Amino acid sequence: VADCENHRVQVLSCDGDDGGISLVSKLGEEGSQPSQLKCPSDVAIDHDHDRVLVTDYRNHGVQSWCLSDQSLLSCVGRRGSGDLELNNPRGIAIDKHHHRIIVVDTFNHRLVFLSSIDFSFLFSVANQGSRPGKFCLPSGIAIDDDRHRIIVADKLNHRVQVLSSIDGSFLFEFG
């Protein structure tokens, strides 16, 4: 669970038959150095690579942590609008079919596609606007693996947009 105001990720477990939830561990602490977080906003679990991916909203980056031992694996991003630069990223999802990580780069009004192998920049889609395929403060993301779709909450346009997970092209919107 991304615990923004406490600057950490809480790893929880469902215990036993009663469905109780218990704290397993905590990742991160407040700060701007590697393994430190400033308002983590979303997490994605990548079981294929034994890691948890975290969008670090106020540090303008993405951190990768090992699921097994909770060690920091890597950090990418810094504030800006270039290829590996982010501006207050909110959401993150894993596109397993295309071996990509998709980051919701909220204040740059775009989605950033990274390689799930080495976090290299692949491409980005959209920028600010209200037309189909444009965003105004996108905030959340989900992947429909079966239909090869990306579902994005487009906050200030008050809609949800659906894009192709193949190339990020606009498919339809609702809301």
Label each residue range with its predicted role.
Residues S13-D18, C66-Q70, S115-D118, S164-D167:
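Short loop/turn segments that connect beta-strands within beta-propeller blades
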Residues I45-H49, I94-H98, I143-R147:
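Residue-level detector of Asp-centered blade-edge/turn motifs that repeat once per structural unit
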Residues G16-S41, L72-R90, F121-S139, D167-G175:
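Gly/Pro-rich loop segments of beta-rich domains
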Residues H98, I117-S120, R147, I166-S169:
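Thr-biased low-complexity repeat/linker tracts and other Thr-enriched repetitive architectures
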Residues V1, Q10, R51-L53, R100-I102, ...:
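Conserved beta-propeller blade signature
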Residues C4-E5, C14, Y57-R58, T106-F107, ...:
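Short loop/turn segments immediately following the C-termini of beta-strands
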